[in-house]
Amino acid sequence: MLSRPHPLAFNRALREDPEQPTRSAHHKWLLDPSAEDKVLADDAHWVRARLRRNRVPEAAIEKHLSVIGNRPAMAAAIGWYRARRTRHAPIGPTHVPTLFIWGDADDTVGRIAAEGTAEFIAAPYTFAPLAGVGHYAADQVPEQVSTPMLAHLALHPV
C-alpha cells in the first residue's frame, strides 16, 4: 500500500482523530458532479497547487497531467472517491503480505490512520514510514519507495 491506510483504520481515524476529517475534506467535495471541471479549471490550478504543496517535482506534475489532465480521465480518477460511497460487504482484515509505505508529512492521511492499519492485516506486515515525505511519496522519493517495495516483492513473490 502506498499512502492509503486500510479502509477500517481510515474510518476509525475519521471518528477518533480530530485532524483526519479536515485532512480528508477534499473527499466530500470531489463527489460533486462538477468536480472534474473544478479541478481542471485554470489549467488544472487545483491539481497543480496540491501537487506543488506536496513538493512533487514539476516534471512529475506535467506527466500526471498528461494522463489525467482531461475531463474523461479526471472523471475516472475521481471515480475512486465516488466508489467509496457504494455500500459493500464489510471489509475484514487483509490476508496477504502487506507493505505500507507512508510519508509522515502526508497532508491527507494522519498518523493514527497510518499506524492503525497494522490491526487490520492478518499476514506478514511491514510499516515503512518515510520522514518528511508527503502523500505523493513515489514522486517525491522514488528510490525510498522502490527499495522497500522490491525487497517486499522478493520476500513474497506473486
Q: How would you label these PLM feature ranges?
A:
Residues 1-129, 150-157:
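Flexible "cap/lid" subdomain of the alpha/beta-hydrolase fold that forms the substrate-access gate
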Residues 133-146:
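Catalytic histidine-centered segment of alpha/beta-hydrolase-like enzymes
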